[in-house]
C-alpha cells in the first residue's frame, strides 16, 4: 500500500520556522517527483515546491510565494520528504500536503496524497 504521512505542523509566530516531514512507504521513493501543496483557509490549493526524482538529481523548484524562504529536501535512506519553512508569514497559514507526482508533471498527475498537516502563523 502506498502511503504518505505528513507531520511537523503547528502554531508559530511570524518570522519563525518549522520543518514539515512526509514519511513515505509502498513505492520506490527515488523514482518519483514529490510535491508540496498547501490550502490556505477558504482558498484553493496552491502548489509550492517540487523535488524531482533521482534521474534529475533531486533538483528542486518553488513557487514565487515561497522561493527564498522554503527549502524542499529528501532523506533517500528513510524515504522522507521535508519542507523547511523559514521567515514564516501570516499568509503561510494553511494545510500542507505532500503528494506523489506520478508522471513528473507538477500540474496534473498527483496520484497519491497525504492527509495533511496544519500550519498556523500567528502572534
From Swiss-Prot:
Keywords: Adaptive immunity, Hybridoma, Immunity, Immunoglobulin
CC per GO annotation: extracellular region; immunoglobulin complex
Keyword Ion transport carried by entry: no
Domain of life of the source: Eukaryota
GO biological process: immunoglobulin mediated immune response
Molecular function in Gene Ontology: antigen binding
Gene3D superfamilies in the cross-refs: Immunoglobulins
Disulfide partners: none
Name assigned to this protein: Ig heavy chain V region HPCG8
Organism: Mus musculus
Taxonomic lineage from the root: Eukaryota, Metazoa, Chordata, Craniata, Vertebrata
Amino acid at each position: 500500500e502506498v502511503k504518505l504521512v505528513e507531520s511537523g505542523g503547528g502554531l508559530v509566530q511570524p518570522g519563525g520556522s518549522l520543518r514539515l516531514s512526509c514519511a513515505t512507504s509502498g513505492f520506490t521513493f527515488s523514482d518519483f517527483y514529490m510535491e508540496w501543496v498547501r490550502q490556505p483557509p477558504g482558498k484553493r490549493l496552491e502548489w509550492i515546491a517540487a523535488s524531482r526524482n533521482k534521474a534529475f538529481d533531486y533538483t528542486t523548484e518553488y513557487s514565487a510565494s515561497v522561493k527564498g524562504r522554503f527549502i524542499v529536501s529528501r532523506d533517500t535512506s528513510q524515504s522522507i520528504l521535508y519542507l523547511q519553512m523559514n521567515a514564516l508569514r501570516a499568509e503561510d497559514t494553511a494545510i500542507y500536503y505532500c503528494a506523489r507526482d506520478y508522471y513528473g508533471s507538477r500540474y496534473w498527475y498527483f496520484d497519491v496524497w497525504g492527509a495533511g498537516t496544519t500550519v498556523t502563523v500567528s502572534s
